[in-house]
Amino acid sequence: IRYIPRKKTTSASVKPAHEDKKENPRREFLSFAGLLAGTALLKAQEKKVDGGLAVIEDKKIPNRITPITPPGSLSASNIAQHCTACQLCISACPNQVLRPSGNLMTFMQPEMSYERGYCRPECTKCSEVCPTGAIHPITVAEKSSIQIGHAVWVKKNCIPLTDGVDCGNCARHCPVGAIQMVPFHGRHRHRGGRENSEQDKTIMIPVINTERCIGCGTCENLCPARPFSAIYVEGHEHHRII
């Protein structure tokens, strides 16, 4: 028989098992909170500067009279009646166009907005996943002829008029050719030197063919004006076939 001496442990040096169990969730929570805070900080830094050269200002949502609903939903009343707010269409949207509505009448049902992307003509993801018929399945060809809204030009926000520089971004990127740039002659603000000045100048401004526009939001999303776009989409209560 052999005896091996062991160091005596005091009650202060040994923590009860139930204390460890209490501390573990606390550590996990603090770690998770730290991770979220770090992620949020990185996102904020990404938004603040563009390559360290210029400050980025986020776009603000325009005040639309009529909300925009996805192609295939037929009308605002149809989607309000049949949508169960399951969020499948919002999750499936690859362009960050769909988001849950904050309106009490249509709470958590999908609503379209174009600050972060636009509704690409070749995408029909939301119509493929809807399980209730709130958004009917449509083909790419059908989508190109569905008018869910129309573009509206806001003169006071347009960069050629506010800054005296050429733009035309909306017309260049419109997938259906619904926007044309036309000459406009008048006194326009010109940024140069130390002070802003006005001078007579012919500039190009956009004109919208509302009969041809399908409301995809390409123009609104790609408009460089901040915080509000110089062109935005107003929704249609009932979708039209053009």
Please place each PLM-identified region on the residue numbering.
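Non-ligating segments of multi-cofactor redox enzymes
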Residues: 1-242
